[in-house]
Amino acid sequence: MQKSISFFVIFSILWGSLFLFSIIGSLGTTPIPLTKDSKFLMSSILPQGWGFFSKNPRDTAIGLYEAENASAKVRWPNMRADNLFGLYRYGRSQGVEMGVIYSQVGKEQWTACKEKDLGACKSKAKTVQLKTPAPRPLLCGSYYLTKEDIVPWSYSKYTPSSYQVKSIVKVVISCSKT
């Protein structure tokens, strides 16, 4: 019993120290300075650091809406019940396919939208014909692809949606299912 408690304490101290030094090593100037050698050692042990957690929350989001109605076509987030809480890959596949379609739309094809209503933006959108390169396409037909700004949480009670459409394009996606 004493042996397992000692092992647990030593193991906890080692992992806790590694975690603490990885955080301190990724910070700038701190009250607990590390030498250059210590920072180099930490970056060689944990090379990726903590940067993968730092996505800008104000980045532009991409939206995809059916041409016939205002509902979002894609089945996100992935952890919803109709995606079997992440087990069903349909939503993830749509995201990849939508990214490929988004990359095919040129900058000059987007129409700026200052209206708050998605319907008003739809009436101004340019139409673009695209062909999906996906071997088993999920997105075929007419959709509206949007660039949207996320409304900050502090303003969310003043807007009907958590996103504000900044630009829009109508894409007609032709598919050759094999």
From Swiss-Prot:
Kindly give the membrane topology term recorded for this protein.
Single-pass membrane protein
Q: What does the UniProt keyword field contain?
A: Membrane, Transmembrane, Transmembrane helix
What is a single cellular component term in the Gene Ontology annotation?
membrane
* Alphabetized Pfam families for the sequence: SdpA
Q: Which residues cross the membrane?
A: 7-29
Predominant location category: membrane
Q: Where in the cell is it found?
A: Membrane
Q: What NCBIfam families does the record tag this protein with? A: export_SdpA
Supply the name of the protein: Uncharacterized protein YitP
What's the encoding gene here?
yitP
